[in-house]
């Protein structure tokens, strides 16, 4: 689809169906900017929500004086894999399948899915609770620790560094697997059965690998 309008002023582009695709660190700022235009029939999807992003977003709207909250949902991860290929260009390498989505209010989910554009709907799979989408947040495993372990490479502008393919070596993969094990254990204790990151990679990208390291290495979308 063609982009109808782009603007740095949120007032110019806000609609009744909003997909927030910023990092979670920007969610509160987006909520504050959206607050003057929010209404009870609006749909807001945090793509991704990360960990309980829907709750955080709703609380920020309330702080801004919003009384009747819109329909708010969160996804476990962003629906596409992309990289910035130049200052003004982004390349999408893959669209993820069965991205889990849940609503702050269970009654909102059917409304949200019915209003979702047909071009996006096939990529999302509804879940009953944002507890599931939050614990199923694979970004907490794939992003945080590898960034700390590769901060030197990341800050070196002259290095041709590919975050997943170069940054997640065998030792890094072994470390984040332990984080993933703990994530799944905490989720299970809270009543949620979630898949491992390795299983998520197999399901989402169709990769083959005996462990997390091999699944990352065999993911063509991570080689760019």
Protein language model features and the residues they cover:
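Rossmann-like NAD(P)(H) cofactor-binding subdomain of soluble oxidoreductases
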Residues: 24-86
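Conserved N-terminal Rossmann-fold NAD(P) cofactor-binding segment
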Residues: 1-15
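Substrate/ligand-engaging "lid" and interaction regions
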Residues: 59, 79-179
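Short coil/loop linkers at secondary-structure junctions
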Residues: 67, 121-123, 193
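Small-residue-rich helix-loop
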Residues: 172, 176-222
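Conserved beta-strand termini and adjacent loop/short-helix elements that scaffold enzyme active sites
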Residues: 9, 75, 127-129, 197
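N-terminal Rossmann-like NAD(P) cofactor-binding module of classical short-chain dehydrogenase/reductase
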Residues: 18-19
């Amino acid at each position: 689809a063609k982009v109808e309008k782009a603007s740095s002023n949120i007032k110019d582009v806000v609609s009744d169906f909003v997909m927030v695709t910023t990092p979670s660190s920007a969610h509160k700022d987006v909520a504050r900017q959206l607050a003057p235009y929010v209404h009870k029939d609006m749909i807001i999807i945090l793509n991704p929500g990360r960990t309980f992003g829907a709750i955080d977003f709703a609380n920020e709207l309330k702080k801004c004086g919003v009384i009747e909250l819109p329909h708010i949902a969160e996804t476990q991860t962003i629906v596409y894999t992309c990289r910035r290929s130049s200052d003004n260009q982004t390349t999408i390498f893959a669209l993820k399948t069965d991205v889990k989505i849940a609503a702050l209010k269970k009654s909102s989910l059917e409304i949200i899915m019915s209003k979702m554009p047909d071009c996006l709907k096939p990529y999302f799979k509804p879940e009953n609770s944002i507890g599931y989408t939050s614990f199923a947040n694979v970004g907490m495993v794939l992003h945080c620790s590898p960034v700390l372990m590769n901060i030197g490479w990341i800050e070196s502008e002259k290095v041709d560094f590919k975050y997943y393919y170069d940054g997640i070596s065998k030792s890094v993969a072994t470390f984040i697997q332990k984080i993933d094990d703990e994530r799944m254990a905490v989720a299970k204790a809270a009543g949620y059965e979630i898949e491992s990151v390795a299983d998520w990679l197999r399901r989402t990208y169709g990769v083959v690998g005996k462990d997390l390291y091999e699944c990352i290495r065999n993911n063509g979308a991570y080689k760019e």
